[in-house]
């Protein structure tokens, strides 16, 4: 038996691979930092990235803990908490996202990406690896239940449009409720 097959423990990743997977550094930056590490062997990989200005030191520390599996993942922690801890969001940015989220009911991560605070690849990394969620099963917004009442049930309400035809109703049933038809 070889050593790889006897080691059943969790795989420890290299911080550079984790940062690249999270979309925080490119392949070229990874290769450059690896070259620098050969010259400056007294520096840690995250310190090299920080000195080059590619990431901040708290971000390097967060991902170093994750790579070494020393990061404590807590079920009650939310995405924003982890992004703050990783120094990828400021408290001001967090507050802006939460304020906007109350208005338009979009998901926190979607707003962080749309506002340009984090790349989509970073959001996917946090959802998949940190929060252990499937990336493809989330929508950009949260739906909230609003009780619907017909115009007939509302006092003093008048219908302003003619009733929908049977053809329109059948077409509406066939479309995906999450699809947005911009034209037509």
From Swiss-Prot:
Region (Disordered): 146-177
Protein name stated in the entry: Uncharacterized protein SYNPCC7002_A1588
Organism of derivation: Picosynechococcus sp. (strain ATCC 27264 / PCC 7002 / PR-6)
Composition bias type Polar residues, residue spans: 150-172
SUPFAM superfamilies tied to this protein: EspE N-terminal domain-like (SSF160246)
